[in-house]
Design a protein with these regions (language model features):
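Glycine-rich, proline-tolerant flexible connector loops at the mouths of alpha/beta enzymes
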Residues: 37-65
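Alpha-helix-loop-beta-strand connector modules within alpha/beta enzyme cores
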Residues: 60-86, 90-94, 118-123
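Conserved anion-binding
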Residues: 87, 99-129
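Hydrophobic faces of well-ordered beta-strands that scaffold small-molecule active sites
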Residues: 24-29, 49-51, 77-80, 100-102
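Short, ordered loop/turn segments at secondary-structure junctions
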Residues: 53-56, 82-83, 105-107
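N-terminal amphipathic alpha-helix/helix-capping segment at the start of soluble metabolic enzymes
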Residues: 2-31
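Short, acidic/polar
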Residues: 30-43, 83-91
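Glycine-enriched alpha-helix->loop->beta-strand junction motifs that scaffold or abut catalytic
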Residues: 44-48, 94-99, 119-120
Length: 129
């Protein structure tokens, strides 16, 4: 069943294909609470819209609206979470992020921890209902 807050497989597949292409993936870095800007990015043909929750003005409710706009426009919602805390990673994925960007990772141990936080058990530590 389709949920308007979950990224469409087309937008995620388009983003992954662009990442692996010679051109690379193109998308704006967005510090906004206005879904219209995210929708415009999709209609402009970008591969992703990077939604900044580290420095941006948004809440989880606002993030859900931004993600919904990305899905309407067919652009992959990539969410930059603050400092890679497990709760932010979990909630960003729960509200429909197609990918997460984790800032300020300095060690391999930190990288392993955030990968684990993004994956469900038994592979990772992300919680389930």
């Amino acid at each position: 069943m389709y949920s308007p807050t979950m990224p469409t497989m087309d937008s995620v597949a388009k983003f992954k294909a662009a990442l692996n292409s010679e051109r690379g993936a193109l998308g704006p870095f967005m510090i906004t609470s206005d879904p219209a800007f995210v929708e415009a990015a999709g209609h402009a043909g970008y591969d992703f819209a990077l939604l900044d929750m580290e420095h941006g003005p948004g809440s989880f409710q606002n993030l859900q609206n931004l993600i919904r706009a990305a899905n309407v426009a067919g652009v992959c919602p990539v969410v930059r979470v603050p400092r890679g805390t497990d709760i932010w990673i979990d909630r960003a994925l729960d509200v429909g992020a197609g990918a997460v960007l984790i800032p300020q990772i300095d060690t391999a141990e930190q990288a392993r921890a955030v990968v684990s936080a993004a994956k469900f058990s038994p592979v990772g530590s992300r919680g389930t209902c």
